[in-house]
Amino acid sequence: FASDMSIGRYTAQRAGIGINSGRIRGINSKIRGGEVAHTGVIPFLKKFEATVRCCTQNGVRGGSATVHFPFWHQEIEDILVLKNNKGTEDNRVRKLDYSIQLNKTMYERLLSQGKITLFSPKDVPGLYEAFFSDQDKFKELYEKYEKDSKIKKKTLSAMQLFSALIKERAETGRIYIMNVDHANTHSSFKDTVYMSNLCQEITLPTKPLQHIDDKEGEIALCILSAINVGILKDLDDMEELCDLAVRALDEIIDYQKYPVRAAELSTKARRSLGVGYIGLAHYLAKNQVKYGDKKALTLVHRLTEAFQYYLLKASVNLAKEKGACDNFYRTKYADGILPIDTYKKEVDEICNIKLQYDWEALRDEVKAHGLRHSTLSAQMPSESSSIVSNATNGIEPPRGFLSVKKSKKGPLKQIVPQYQSLQKYYTLLWDMPNNDGYINIVAVMQKFFDQAISGNWSYNPTHFDNNEVPMSVMLKDLLNTYKYGWKTSYYQNTYDYKSDGSVEEPQHSMGWHDNIKENPVEREDFKGTDEEYEEYCESCAI
């Protein structure tokens, strides 16, 4: 209940919310030796939904939240369908989004055509903690509890459960995925990461609150900025830009007000930052490279290496001036461990080029002087800032050369940068035959990023037989994102080829003309189709 109060306070401050509900017992679990039966997760989700929707943001919309659950939770079958249009108001909580947490054991059960066993977290001591912090221990405990006849459980086909996950993700566009093992092994923290944020780019430690003024609890905050890589002339220009971004965000940490004590103490002790990109599509087009080209991976590798290197260098320099953050000792950086040491090595199968910068000298500096910040990088959705900067949206391919964005203030037309000279080099989203190139680009970025990347899956049904995206294609993308180290998967976008005309057919001169809505909508039947929605939270607006 203290967490619910803090959610309300931050929603009132226009924040988007990440909630970890994975510890909540399953329905009908025994309380006080069976004296009381637990109500399960849905009543608590309805409470959270009411809290985030009761405060209007900018006088326009209610708040938003993403709730996280492990895939093996007793109620996962009911959780997966909470957003769809079937069912009743009693068993649906449509105005929240959901992130389903997976790990290696879950994927192994799928690949071996095995079973997945569901438990109430309270009935299986140690399993929830091990799920995030120790994969070998998790597997040992999971198999032990599967064999224990005294523990209440339910066993399902792994393919059946994964298919339900993919089906709901495809139909709603808003069932997200978090690979909790990658989020922790490729993390800058020694502390465990249990959840992400609203938009799935933040991976910071959290701790439940026992009361609203609890100093032992921990609320993680997103301190964000983005660099427009589309206008870079030279990679070494990153040095000044990264230094400026880091110094500006560092000042914000001390300047801003904190409505909850647990957020202030944690944020000031860890000083975690999340700097990302806008304009990646422009950057690739300037280099005459498409998203699916092998050369794109080399370009992104060099770009992101420079980006993370100079972010770390800026934080070291600030540590020399002001001192390392108080909780630096609780990071892997304190032991000289860098992102280049912990990334998923399968990335080398798709891009294996030599590092361009002197990482060993930087490692020595980090160990000697510390860092001012526990994290430096995160790739957020960036629709608003991309519009203001006249840049392409974050790392996304544009949906069209020209987009018309509608809001209460009227339509805004935006054309991709350098349209006349670069139009033949831009990759348009709905022209891509598959997600392979995009998945690989995000994987290469994740090699260097110390937090996560809001990566999307996008499908044009007209590229497939009978205008239907096969389940096998989506499962392949799920497995590839895991194989190449994605920490999270955000939206699933599907082109609405049956559009009533709000989206025109492809044209030779201006490509896809999207009807992009900025005004908030009630998206109970949202399918993430051809409409590119304005990011609807202030937490990821930069």
Q: Which positions does each model-derived feature cover?
A:
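A glycine-rich phosphate-binding loop feature that marks nucleotide/adenosyl-phosphate handling sites
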Residues: 21-27, 67-75, 101-103, 122-129, ...
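Function-dense linear segments that define catalytic or interfacial modules
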Residues: 1-33, 41-44, 54-58, 168-267, ...
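Catalytic alpha/beta core of large soluble enzyme barrels
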Residues: 199-207, 249, 253-254, 351-356, ...
